[in-house]
Amino acid sequence: MSSGYSSLEEDAEDFFFTARTSFFRRAPQGKPRSGQQDVEKEKETHSYLSKEEIKEKVHKYNLAVTDKLKMTLNSNGIYTGFIKVQMELCKPPQTSPNSGKLSPSSNGCMNTLHISSTNTVGEVIEALLKKFLVTESPAKFALYKRCHREDQVYACKLSDREHPLYLRLVAGPRTDTLSFVLREHEIGEWEAFSLPELQNFLRILDKEEDEQLQNLKRRYTAYRQKLEEALREVWKPD
């Protein structure tokens, strides 16, 4: 491991955009949130690629790279590469005493990890905590993907079984298109998002409110017209 990034090695060889609007709910206190629940909330919208498709995408990815952090495709179809994870922790995590490591608590701190396509979200979280000798359970943290479209920012929590390097490959190397964020898993949903994300949620809610209001007006306008027609039939002279 160099001072610039961490590396995640795997022994085994066999091993994409929605706005999250369910940010009002909190996780039940004292009960861990299962991976299956996460999968149900955040459905994976991608299907895995064939070896030829992966080869083509890796080639295009490397052509677009500007920071020399390229991907490498192995003969067995597994590829390795780099992801950058931004630390957005509300409080400093517990670390080993006299660890000599920098604290990961600095808001906005960026870390680069060298991983393979087989590494899951859960393994990436463990690698980040191990890098800083954090003694807290990985279950207390969650990895989010943050996507940017025009002037809007979307974020959703990834399930522990998803593969970050695959998401990076599909999205391309630009972090202004897709980025990864580590946050506390148990924090309230309101506090877990940045100001631009919350502002985007407000825009979505305002739009939904306006649509519901227009639907309600159309419904009662149609009801009024039918009622007036019925009254005219009743009072029509014989």
UniProtKB/Swiss-Prot annotation:
Which GO-annotated molecular functions does the record name?
identical protein binding
- GO CC annotations, alphabetized: cytoplasm; cytosol; microtubule; plasma membrane
Annotated Ras-associating domain residues: 79-186
Is Acetylation included in the keywords of this UniProt record? yes
Compositional bias of kind Basic and acidic residues: 38-48
Which subcellular locations apply to this protein?
Cytoplasm; Cytoplasm, Cytoskeleton
Specify the superkingdom: Eukaryota
Q: Where is this region: Disordered?
A: 26-48
Q: What is its main location?
A: cytoplasm
SARAH domain mapped to chain residues? 187-234
Fetch the Pfam families from UniProt. Answer: Nore1-SARAH, RA
GO BP: signal transduction
Acetylation as UniProt keyword: yes
List residues, modification N-acetylserine. Answer: S2
Q: Which UniProt keywords apply?
A: Acetylation, Cytoplasm, Cytoskeleton, Microtubule
Where expressed (tissue)?
A: Widely expressed.
Record-linked PANTHER family? RAS ASSOCIATION DOMAIN-CONTAINING PROTEIN 3, RASSF
Name used for this protein in its record: Ras association domain-containing protein 3
